[in-house]
Swiss-Prot record:
Residues 40-48 are annotated as: Interaction with RB1 in competition with E2F1. GO terms for biological process: regulation of DNA-templated transcription; symbiont-mediated perturbation of host cell cycle G1/S transition checkpoint; symbiont-mediated suppression of host innate immune response; symbiont-mediated suppression of host JAK-STAT cascade via inhibition of STAT1 activity; symbiont-mediated suppression of host type I interferon-mediated signaling pathway. Interacts with host UBE2I; this interaction interferes with polySUMOylation. Interacts with host RB1; this interaction induces the aberrant dissociation of RB1-E2F1 complex thereby disrupting the activity of RB1 and activating E2F1-regulated genes. Interacts with host ATF7; the interaction enhances ATF7-mediated viral transactivation activity which requires the zinc binding domains of both proteins. This is Early E1A protein. GO terms for cellular component: host cell nucleus. It is found in: Host nucleus. A zinc finger (unnamed) spans 145-163. Residues 84-96 have a biased composition (Pro residues). Plays a role in viral genome replication by driving entry of quiescent cells into the cell cycle. Stimulation of progression from G1 to S phase allows the virus to efficiently use the cellular DNA replicating machinery to achieve viral genome replication. E1A protein has both transforming and trans-activating activities. Induces the disassembly of the E2F1 transcription factor from RB1 by direct competition for the same binding site on RB1, with subsequent transcriptional activation of E2F1-regulated S-phase genes and of the E2 region of the adenoviral genome. It comes from Canine adenovirus serotype 2.
Length: 171
């Protein structure tokens, strides 16, 4: 097979038109509508009508103005009584301000605070000084933290939530 080299055309537009006339594909005979080339919208496909009966309500400075405007339009349209906003919020404001929260309240609960002699939990009769894991057959296992020591000194067999998982399994 021999290949021939065609000289470059002087006018590209005319050259392309000549090639299209020689080739003449079937798709050139198809007629397309003169509308927009974009695909149809969902409104066109499903015959959905847009509801434009509600007028646009702009933002206003006062809620009272919005209440009177909306009540006038709803009473005339549907006959329903308008909903009114109570003058005072039924939810009381939160009394805690950021200034009243102490730094101690923001500490992690796993870091146990140390109690001094003036604290009501740490009394003079307290013998608990450090973390310990002792077993007394008459009392049972004792896992040490300041909260557990307070309850155990009062003859209450209780463990705090941090010491409970450390305790031995009871059968």
């Amino acid at each position: 097979m021999k290949y021939t080299i065609v000289p470059a055309p002087r006018n590209l537009h005319d050259y392309v038109l000549e090639l299209l006339e020689e080739w003449h594909p079937d798709c050139l005979d198809c007629e397309y509508p003169n509308g927009s080339p974009s695909p149809p919208t969902l409104h066109d496909l499903f015959d959905v009508e847009l509801e434009t009966s509600h007028p646009f309500v702009g933002l206003c400075d006062s809620c009272a103005e919005a209440d009177t405007d909306s009540s006038a339009s709803t009473e005339g349209d549907s006959g329903f009584s308008p909903l009114s906003t109570p003058p005072v919020s039924p939810i009381p404001p939160h009394p805690t301000s950021p200034a009243s929260i102490s730094d101690d309240m923001l500490l992690c609960l796993e870091e146990m605070p140390t109690f001094d002699d003036e604290d009501e939990v740490r009394s003079a009769a307290t013998t608990f000084e450090r973390w310990e894991n002792t077993f007394d057959p008459h009392v049972g296992p004792i896992f040490g933290c300041l909260r557990c020591a307070f309850y155990q000194e009062q003859d209450d067999n209780a463990l705090c939530g941090l010491c409970y998982p450390k305790g031995p399994c009871r059968r």
